[in-house]
Amino acid sequence: MARKGVDVAVALVLVALAAFPAVHSIGVCNGVLGNNLPAPSDVVTLYRSKRIDAMRIYEPESKVLTALSGTGIAVLMDVGPALPSLASSPSAAAAWVKANVSSFPGVSFRYIAVRNEVMDSAGQSTILPAMRNVQRALAAAGSPIKVSTSVRFDVFNNTSPPSNGVLADKSGFLRPILNFLARPARPLLANVYPYFAYKGNPRDIQLTFATFVPGSTTVNDNGLTYTNLFDAMVDSIYAALEKAGTPGVKVVISESGWPSDQGFGATAQNARAYNQGLINHVGNGSPKKAGALESYIFAMFNENLKDGDELEKNFGLFKPNMSPAYAITF
């Protein structure tokens, strides 16, 4: 029993150390909604060969976590389908942390996301209790990993010009979450897709402005100049956070990308322009917030079992056989 206690203590120390990976600006989301995707070990090898040093995964998966162990790749991990039990039971949260975090001391966990884009009111009501329970379980395990949740961009409103941004949260679920994130400092994870803004309004949004290609479009707002849509969207989030009384909450872009096929403006040329532009850009921050803006490209692979329009299956930087969908450099 004493030996077991020592082993557990050592494992928790290793998790704590692994939870402090060097902060880098760009990662890639590793979705698994496909029946032809490569094995986790091959995926991790591809990340390393391309010098991609951060990965988002959408639920704990032991084969993926085992492949990540010892690589130094920083991990943003969603809790997956465990949300109801995590919200209702501190003991379930403790068991979840033990099974999915403490059991993988060689994995460089950076954040735990309590679900992704939860839009139904019943689900939204469980997010904050689950965040609290998971954060307490991590703290009890001696882990400094931060807990957050990933939101869609449309939880913000009046986003043009950026300084007009406000919360569009009619149910009020987001404001208490922001207060939780603010003390102590934890980031808000936000999914930001200029592609969908461009697709919805190509008359008023120039393609060059949406894809980081230098063009004639600039937006001037409160003394700040915007040369791309991504920055404008990000700074509208920061404006909304200020108006909500939580100006110190950092934003992490938990998804952003551009499809290469099967939709309006969805070409390999546009996808490459956007994603390469994003990679090159985020180290500089935005006009409102200088400094690196941590961001995750969606996604690593085209996923043939994704729900929704066909374009949803074509966001990958790579094909399932691991050949590039188009040229990209990290």
Curated annotation (Swiss-Prot):
PANTHER family listed in its UniProt record: GLUCAN ENDO-1,3-BETA-GLUCOSIDASE BG1-RELATED-RELATED (PTHR32227)
Catalytic activity: Hydrolysis of (1->3)-beta-D-glucosidic linkages in (1->3)-beta-D-glucans
Listed name of the protein: Glucan endo-1,3-beta-glucosidase GIII
Highest taxon listed in the record's lineage: Eukaryota
One example GO MF annotation: glucan endo-1,3-beta-D-glucosidase activity
Active site: 117, 255
EC number(s) on file: 3.2.1.39
Pfam families (alphabetical): Glyco_hydro_17
Originating organism: Hordeum vulgare (Barley)
InterPro entries: Glyco_hydro_17, Glyco_hydro_17_plant, Glycoside_hydrolase_SF
Keywords: Glycosidase, Hydrolase, Plant defense, Signal
Family: Belongs to the glycosyl hydrolase 17 family.
Single GO BP term: defense response
Signal sequence coordinates: 1-25
Function: May provide a degree of protection against microbial invasion of germinated barley grain through its ability to degrade fungal cell wall polysaccharides.
